[in-house]
Structure formats: structure tokens, C-alpha cells
């Protein structure tokens, strides 16, 4: 599968590693992202849970990022979340 050239550049730079994509892993990350979204929606009606809502949405978004990376056959190394999200 063709992937964005940026991913290949990040592999060469050592920030990402090339992997064999697994559809089951992609689906599992999407399911986890949905769980985070469900929890965030549960917290939406309670202002005292704003931090939990924010963190749940952030973690859910990152699960989607990881699903996309898995789909394209790459995984972040020690580059951190920021680079993966960009």
C-alpha cells in the first residue's frame, strides 16, 4: 500500500519504524477510540468532569492517529505523541 512520503522520511530519520499492518490492530484502536468518545459524551453534562472529558477526547484522537499509522505500516518509536499527531 502506498503511504505518504512523509512517513518514509520519518522512517529514514529513525522517528518511525516500518511494520506489517494488521487490520485487527486497526479495528481494535478504532473500538478503543469509540469507547473514549462514549465516555467523553457521558462527561459532557457534568462540568466537574471537564478535565476527564478533555483527556478522554485526546486519548481517543490519539487512538485514531495510531490506527492510521498502523494502516500505513508505520509505528512511532520514541518520537512521542506530538510527532505522530502532526
Regions found by a protein language model. Give the residues of each.
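Terminal alpha-helical segments
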Residues: 1-86
